[in-house]
Amino acid sequence: MELEAVLKERTAAAGDPGRVLGAWVRSGWSAAGPSVLESEGGSGGPLAFESTSSRILELASKDNEPEYEALPDGSNVTTHMLAGAVAGVMEHCLMYPVDCVKTRMQSLQPDPAARYRNVMDALSKIVRTEGFWRPLRGLNVTATGAGPAHALYFACYEKLKKTLSDIIHPGGNSHIANGTDYSCPA
């Protein structure tokens, strides 16, 4: 089961020999037929198993997946700061109306005949009675502060991640380093 998962995760292309090998392993070793094993110089005995197991280990040890949670290798501090600022401002702009409604709902006393049934109902009633811009009131100050804050956070995070990864696991990525530097800037 775990071997199948490793083979499936580590191979990206549909025509990759690892997928063919994985299908052969899942089918019970005999799907290739004795003629294939004999043509490779074996009779299906320990030699065939050793070559297959070494091929499986080779495929499993390849790390050909790109790092999807990072900017390209040539990125500098300015790029990280810009990415952080844009991400922070966008996050606050999208979530601010929901946060406004959440705050409004939390300030009300719990009552079976409540004024709002859910978040969408509350948002629509606020917009209808108080105007379209009411849930966005104060967003400009929040977005202005979010840009620099998230820019510094992202830049510090990436710098610490690289520094700690080089110390803990030189030349690679370390989950311990990522978790440690996640808690530092906060």
From Swiss-Prot:
Q: Name one GO biological process term.
A: iron import into the mitochondrion
PROSITE patterns on file: SOLCAR (PS50920)
Instruction: Provide the residue intervals of the Solcar repeats.
Output: 75-163
Q: Where in the cell is it found?
A: Mitochondrion inner membrane
Q: How does it sit in the membrane?
A: Multi-pass membrane protein
Swiss-Prot/TrEMBL keywords: Ion transport, Iron, Iron transport, Membrane, Mitochondrion, Mitochondrion inner membrane, Transmembrane, Transmembrane helix, Transport
> Carries keyword Nucleus?
no
Q: Which reaction does it catalyse?
A: Fe(2+)(in) = Fe(2+)(out)
Give a Pfam family name: Mito_carr
Give the Gene Ontology MF terms in alphabetical order: ferrous iron transmembrane transporter activity
Which GO cellular component term is one of those annotated? mitochondrial inner membrane
Residues that span the membrane, as ranges: 77-96, 137-157, 172-185
- Describe the family membership recorded for this protein in Swiss-Prot or TrEMBL: Belongs to the mitochondrial carrier (TC 2.A.29) family.
What is known about what this protein does? Mitochondrial iron transporter that mediates iron uptake. Probably required for heme synthesis of hemoproteins and Fe-S cluster assembly in non-erythroid cells.
What name is this protein filed under? Mitoferrin-2A
Originating species: Xenopus laevis
- UniProt lists the gene as slc25a28-a
